[in-house]
């Protein structure tokens, strides 16, 4: 089985949007979508020293709750939002009218610059550790990004309300429900699709303004699965 772990906000909509299509891509084995509440990479007390064990604990808790053991899993695919975390500090822009973070072409708008600087440091340190980690709980593990978040990649919207997320997820799931080829074409052949080498794909997202732009390296995972199926 493939365990898809998603750590980001408005999680139920993410399950709805991606779940049906991914189940069709990975149809030889079941896909279990486990939603981590909130973003584990920015959780209080989580740092590069303990992030791997924290993700491992999530996987173990999920397995225990569903009566699985480590050998029941083929792989763990962890999908994270970049949340523009790789932007330089001068792209974190003070806007006292911003009650919530706002992701714009020129940077992150916030009423608390220091807090965002700290969050970005924590998130990028943790992602650096995770992307170099090949196994968690003896299960092959890889982390893939959605930039600047899942809504941005799937629907080209950066700052969606919960209502928009719900509506967009429903429409997306409906559109690709019985059309896995169209889903794969959209994810793997769009201007936002980052393909090729896994390590290179992370070096790409670190650069310039890329982590606030529309990019995902999930196609690397999808194309590998298709290749496996064909062999």
Feature names for model-found ranges:
Residues 17-49, 56-231:
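C-terminal accessory helical subdomains adjacent to catalytic cores in phosphodiester-
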